[in-house]
């Protein structure tokens, strides 16, 4: 009888001990995100969360997203500590534009070979994003899949559930002629347009770690975490009659603003009302990118656009700016049957 080598899961490239070490490492940061409605802790087969009692007719709002190829840039530059904030931001910002308060978040982390330090940095960023948005990180999945990813490359995805009072859902139906548009400044490109960003870096031959822009490395501008607007917007909704909110993500101005406009309305954006942050000027120049393409691919310094009645504008601006946002009047809503839903002039 021939002796055969006894194989283990670890021999196949899956290290269960590393996975357990990761869980032990992140328990503390995850615990800090806990909301009173959450029942149980990490490790259950499913996460339990009650609905906050203040809602009379609660409606659940869900969203899922990733961070696109910003992740490739983060991996290339070995910066893993803020990509988790981006992941949460992409999900919770999509929820809050409908008036929803984020309740809980789950993440999916997949890699070819689990590096506990890298995964811990990413998940700590996710926990930080949850703290910024007031939602609980209730669980997730860490998948070590040898042969599916190159080396220690990884991918992340997020899923978030929020709640809104049925009578207070923001869906754009109240938008009308004469409404004013308020912009909320972005922290940079957020998590969109990074395939073009990487192409510009490649074609220009620029090293983002040694190239300086506004006194700091270009890499800092490109990897600045997506701004989370949840707490500022939720307070605004409580105190001001908000008609619509657009989150400027993939598709930029041209595709995201029309998503919240009723028929026979048009958003007119005043381009002179703000200056693009330098990173967008650099991208446009280095890539010779046309203006229309810039507004289709990037947020150009505007993370969200809020539509509200003209008499509410001063109150809204004061409230948003006092909460640390960079907010300004960016345009108006006009009655129009034009197929061009957004005009930038």
Curated annotation (Swiss-Prot):
EC number of the protein: 6.3.3.1
Enzyme class: ligase
Secretion signal span: none
Pathway(s) where this gene product acts: Purine metabolism; IMP biosynthesis via de novo pathway; 5-amino-1-(5-phospho-D-ribosyl)imidazole from N(2)-formyl-N(1)-(5-phospho-D-ribosyl)glycinamide: step 2/2
InterPro entries with a match to the protein in the record: PurM-like_C_dom, PurM-like_C_sf, PurM-like_N, PurM-like_N_sf, PurM_cligase
Alphabetical UniProt keywords: ATP-binding, Cytoplasm, Ligase, Nucleotide-binding, Purine biosynthesis
Pfam families, alphabetized: AIRS, AIRS_C
Protein name: Phosphoribosylformylglycinamidine cyclo-ligase
Organism: Escherichia coli O139:H28 (strain E24377A / ETEC)
Underlying gene: purM
């Amino acid at each position: 009888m021939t002796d055969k080598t006894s194989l283990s899961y670890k021999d196949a490239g899956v290290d269960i001990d590393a996975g357990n070490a990761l869980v032990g490492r992140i328990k503390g940061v995850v615990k800090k995100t806990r909301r009173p409605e959450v029942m149980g802790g990490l490790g259950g087969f499913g996460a339990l969360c009650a609905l906050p009692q203040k809602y009379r007719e609660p409606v659940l709002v869900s969203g899922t997203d990733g961070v696109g190829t910003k992740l490739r840039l983060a991996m290339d530059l070995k910066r893993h500590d803020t990509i988790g904030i981006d992941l949460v931001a992409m999900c919770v910002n999509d929820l809050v534009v409908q008036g929803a308060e984020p309740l809980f978040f789950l993440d999916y982390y997949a890699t070819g070979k689990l590096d506990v330090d890298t995964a811990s940095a990413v998940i700590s960023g996710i926990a930080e994003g949850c703290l910024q948005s007031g939602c609980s990180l209730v669980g997730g999945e860490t998948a070590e899949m040898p042969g599916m990813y190159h080396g220690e490359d990884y991918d992340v995805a997020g899923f978030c559930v929020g709640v809104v009072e049925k009578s207070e859902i923001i869906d754009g139906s109240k938008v009308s002629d004469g409404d004013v548009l308020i912009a909320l400044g972005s922290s940079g490109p957020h998590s969109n347009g990074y395939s073009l960003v990487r192409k510009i870096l490649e074609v220009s031959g620029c090293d983002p770690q040694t190239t300086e822009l506004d006194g700091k490395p270009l890499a800092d501008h490109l990897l600045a975490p997506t701004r989370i607007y949840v707490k500022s917007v939720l307070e605004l909704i409580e105190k001001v009659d908000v008609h619509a909110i657009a989150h400027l993500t993939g598709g930029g101005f041209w595709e995201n603003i029309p998503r919240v406009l009723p028929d026979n309305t048009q958003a007119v954006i005043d381009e002179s009302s703000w200056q693009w942050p330098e990173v967008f000027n650099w991208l446009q120049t280095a890539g010779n990118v046309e203006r229309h393409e810039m507004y289709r691919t990037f947020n150009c310094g505007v993370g969200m656009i809020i539509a509200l009645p003209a008499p509410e504008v001063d109150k809204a601006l004061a409230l948003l700016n006092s909460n640390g946002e960079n907010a300004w009047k960016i345009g108006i809503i006009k009655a129009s049957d034009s197929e061009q839903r957004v005009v930038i002039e």
